[in-house]
A protein has these predicted regions:
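Mature, Sec-exported extracytoplasmic domains of Gram-positive
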Residues: 21-215
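Sec-dependent signal peptide recognition
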Residues: 2-10
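C-terminal motif of bacterial Sec signal peptides marking the signal peptidase cleavage site
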Residues: 15-19
């Protein structure tokens, strides 16, 4: 009888340990991210190297002005672009926001992205990279990432698109390394036929070729 009781006690302990081990395995890889937006930016810059593309830090006025974010809802932020933005559309905006503001922030970044895309389509400048933009929402972290090395502008659209996709995949890999998953929420609007999305009117009222901003 004692041997039977001892056997069942031992079996119970083994099952308990196995259950605990299973819970530990379930939690493995689910480390909570506590990085600031700047720390995430620094990680992207380090891991991507030449595929990062940004060399200028943006100001808070840019975050609240151009992107329209409510800074009262932002816990930390980081934003960078390329100093030659007329021909290099590399851009990275990362924010850690307060609870409940992530989707609003994502919508604002989407709106700003559409203006960048409109410019890129109008001049056919760095277009394939812009079309490979990433909009990530992971908990309270939101990011718009237009990153990648410059491709060969003289190459065919197909070759440029393939190169841009490969560069964007590098961004996915780094983001996945931080958050464990990637889910690109960017929306690519269709071209409206005007070639400029209403962002610029390239002729003045008299039909001259002098560019006029704002219509």
């Amino acid at each position: 009888m004692k041997r039977i009781l001892t056997f069942f006690l031992a079996l119970t302990m083994v099952l308990s340990l196995a259950a605990c081990g299973g819970k530990a395995d379930d939690n493995k890889g689910k480390t909570e991210v506590t990085m600031t937006a700047q720390e995430i930016m620094d990680t992207l810059k380090e891991k991507l190297g030449d595929s990062f593309g940004c060399d200028v830090a943006e100001t808070e006025d840019n975050i609240s002005g151009y992107w329209g974010l409510d800074m009262g809802q932002v816990e930390s932020w980081a934003s960078m672009s390329n100093s030659n933005s007329a021909v290099n559309s590399s851009y990275a905006v990362i924010v850690k926001v307060k609870e409940g503001y992530a989707q609003d922030a994502a919508a604002l970044l989407q709106t700003g992205y559409e203006q960048i895309l409109s410019y890129s389509r109008m001049y056919n400048m760095d277009l394939q990279k812009v079309l490979q933009a990433r909009l990530f929402v992971n908990g309270n972290y939101v990011a718009l990432l237009i990153l990648g090395a410059q491709g060969d502008w003289e190459a065919s659209d197909e070759v440029q698109a393939k190169f841009a996709a490969e560069e964007a995949a590098k961004v996915d890999d780094v983001w996945r390394g931080i958050f464990g998953s990637v889910d690109n929420g960017i929306t690519i609007p269709e071209e409206d036929g005007s070639n400029n999305g209403g962002f610029f009117d390239m002729t003045d009222d008299e039909g001259n070729n002098d560019p006029v901003l704002g219509g």
